[in-house]
Amino acid sequence: SKGVMLPYRSLWSNTQFAFEVLTLQPGNKVISILPMAHMYGLAFEFIYEFCAGCHVYFLTRMPSPKIIFQAFSEVKPHIVISVPLIIEKIIKKNVLPKLETLKMKLLLKVPLINDKIKEAVREHMVQAFGGNFYEVIIGGAAFNQDVERLLRSLDFPYTVGYGMTECGPIICYEDWLRYKPGSCGKAAPRMEIKIDSPDPQNIVGEILTRGENVMLGYYKNPEATAQAIDAEGWLHTGDLGVMDEEGNVTIKGRSKNMLLGPSGQNIYPEEIEEKISNLPYVCENIVIQQSDHKLAALIYPDFEEAYKQGLTDADIERIMEENRVAVNAELPAYSQITRIKIYPEEFEK
């Protein structure tokens, strides 16, 4: 692990960014869901709110959907800041099951009824988050595209940002009214972004950034610092992406995570993981390359939901194998999943 040295200019710039775009008022309420040990949570669920004179409510337990719903209902926060996993869990457990019944699928095909249902679902979701917020800001990891499509179809007020500890943390953001679906926004104030690619709009390259938010370097580690920040001050994020002509950045994966297929094809495990996460009873998953260069998926199933439905461990194994077959039907031959391994507990974070 490396210690990140953040100067006061980075803390100031991140806080100033929040004052410029989040516009909370003295006395507004925010629920702190994220750990204070992470810059994302520290910067945007404490430092900014403290400076703005807001009330910060700290969760004292692990943020399960039930606990979060209770907190939203009681506090009614003015803005919601979270990581994708929490939002996805809430939607998968409380929204998708209601939309995926046969009756609901049939009703959604009728135009006028479709609009009424979506309006009701949107209102239900807004109330689930307290009914008093301007937008939900999602960041810290890739956001599931199926969940995002649902939110967009409902005109739900959400946006996806991008950052890292080395930038204290913000790199990209866009207000939900101007946000481009699938992206993570545009360069934040006082930050620049470029893609290390001959064609940044179409050919994936490493995302580079520089500006007031960027760290001084890694604590007592000049070698790692020199590898991360080049002579022109560009921080090499290690993330791969593209950027359109309007400056919207879309992340494709991590350069360190990228795998090579049998004939040299680029495989981005995050894209496969996203497909797997949409399958039945999948809570978390990681795609790895085995010693024989074939791909395997490590899956932590949603045991709570499975057992509630009366399923046995053997049933779960069968369903996961069916999931493997289903995801392979959507993948090219060089990125097929050949094996599933079930994990008994959540992955370490």
Where does each model-flagged region fall?
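Residue-level signal for inorganic ion chemistry
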Residues: 80-83, 193, 247, 276, ...
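C-terminal boundary motif of the adenylate-forming
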Residues: 196, 240, 245, 279-303
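Conserved C-terminal "lid"/linker of ANL adenylate-forming enzymes
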Residues: 284, 293, 325-349
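Conserved adenylation A10 loop of the ANL superfamily
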Residues: 1-3
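Conserved ATP-binding/catalytic segment of the ANL
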Residues: 187, 194, 201-261, 289
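Gly/Ser/Thr-rich phosphate-binding loop
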Residues: 78-81, 91-179, 283-284
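Conserved AMP-binding/adenylation subdomain of ANL enzymes
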Residues: 8, 12-29, 36-124
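Adenylate-forming
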Residues: 214, 248-277, 304-315, 333-337
